[in-house]
Amino acid sequence: MKFRNNLTLYLIFIIVFTIYISLTISIPLKNGKFWHITDTHYDFMYIEGGDEDKQCREVTYKSKYEKGGASSIGNYKCDTSFELLQSSFEYMVKHEEKPDFIIWTGDDPPHLGNSQLNETLVLQSITNMTNLIKGYFPDIPIFPSIGNHDSYPQHQIGVGPNWLFENVAQLWSPFLSNDSIETFKLGGYYTELVSEGFRIISLNTVFYYNENRQCLNLTDPAGQLLWLNETLANASLAGERVWIIGHVPPGYNEKYDVFNFHKQFNDEYLFSFSQYSDIIEFHIYGHEHTDTFRLFYDDPNDHINDIEPTGIMFLSPSLTPWMNQFLPALPNNPGLRLYEYNITSFALLDYYQFWTNLTDNIISGNIDWQLEYRATEFFNTFNLSPVSMYEAYLLIQSVTSQLLKFHFYNSVSYPTKGCDEICKKIQLCSIRHPFTKGFKECLVEI
């Protein structure tokens, strides 16, 4: 009898254990997700009926009686209206209410001249956006970066301590550690250990921006690159995986035909990552308002021998549809991006690019957000690793229809006039050659 009871218990244990193992094996780990918010440029003085030639901030005779004023939804010559801003956050919450965290890469104030701004207005813009994100995503970790418009005068950010770093550090103190607050006060940069084995480094790339005159005579503003090297070295010793985030990306801006960084900073910045490409998963930036990516190498000469890249940068499009009327660039439709990553390896798996057609919205009177494309489907890749994105680049390079579609997505499906040979060269070379020398050689080769 005792033997029979023991046998019964043993069989029950085997059955339960088998069921447990089968369930464990059959149920895959859920992938992590995060929103990337960038270049919102909310204009709190945007008014319905405003004159687009006056940034939609005032009603004029022309806007009232002749040409017609701006829609309450938005205008391609103006920054983000409240209606557009509100709809974007409502859509994000509806689509993915509980992301693991939010990456927010700056540029909150509207595109205004210094005569229309001051320190108080700039800080109020950053405060408004901070409160908005926290309000829609309470208890969700936020990892921010400072942008070139998050300053006064515009684009001018020098070494701290200064009014900007001091005030923003206090504003962001609820989601930054004490160590992060200290380095932010010094230079607007920091690092956070998100979880065991997973680190985010937020860099202040405005130091190197081509319109920032405050750091031209400095070799390493606020010691950021030295600190970066030490942080990456420690991360490597600890066996951590690293993500790099910032506002202004290095390399060539295909929209404005200019390098984003001052010449002396561009290559030095890229070289800072070469020794640690084995632990850096990817970079995320904003600033250009366009949808694109950048490949880079440990050695800038590696592209000559078709060696596969060791790094990848993703540039997300802006929420603002604003068009620079003084430079040869198209506007873009508003965009939002949701990334997907492996919660074990912290590798980037995919992203979902959402958009809204501002032209149609103005006609209908409703804002309709929808999926524009899924990255792995459009690029025909398994994931978003540097090697996979190199394959995506080769597809764009070799298949004309893919290039034209990529160029269309570059401005978030805003109608373009196509992409001629010069356009093709700039698009392809800016993707593959963020180093200055390689880019110039590429323009001749293609």
UniProtKB/Swiss-Prot annotation:
Cofactor(s) the record lists: Zn(2+)
Q: Name one GO biological process term.
A: ceramide biosynthetic process
UniProt-annotated glycosylation sites, renumbered to this chain: 6, 118, 128, 178, 217, 229, 234, 342, 357
Which GO cellular component term is one of those annotated? membrane
What CDD domains does this protein map onto? MPP_ASMase
Query: What EC number is given for this enzyme?
Result: 3.1.4.-
The secretion signal range is 1-26
Positions binding Zn(2+) 1 in this chain are: 39, 41, 107, 289
Q: What is this protein called?
A: Sphingomyelinase phosphodiesterase C
Its source organism is Dictyostelium discoideum (Social amoeba)
> Taxonomy-wise, where does this protein's organism fall, top ranks first?
Eukaryota, Amoebozoa, Evosea, Eumycetozoa, Dictyostelia
